[in-house]
Amino acid sequence: GMMMLPTELTLRTTKDGIRLVNVPVKEVESLCKPLRSWRSLSSDEANRHLKEFYDADCLRIKTTIKLSHATDAGFNLFGQRMIGYDMNSNTLNGRFYSPQDPTSMELSADIYIDRTSIEVFIDGGLYSYSMERRPDTNNREGFHFWGNRIEVKDLQVFSVESIW
């Protein structure tokens, strides 16, 4: 089984009406220590910056990606797709998702990674999901942003302190 972050469900008024939002409880912030932060990167630059974190057990990564020429883009960890956004079909990892402002062509993610699980909170918690961490043992890419000429507008990496 997986241990999940404690989260808080709230209602938020959006341009499309009231929506249910799921975010980690605020106490989780006290476990996170900022390590690195960058802005306006190409996917290749972002991938290079993240190399130093390939072997980390517990990380938090906050990022915003902007699709300009790509119709799909995402973020993998050793071949495992953490984010796969298809703008044409409005899907995120194969499930329907439409951003609040589809014309912005941006997607923000707050990703918590530990030894056994990955939890992702999209666009401030409007969409969230978790998965078992299952890296491809033959994959050496580590963290890998993908998509035709995407911009990684913001990339922040945090260490996450264990509570055990």
Q: What is each PLM-predicted segment?
A:
Residues 1-164:
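Beta-rich accessory regions
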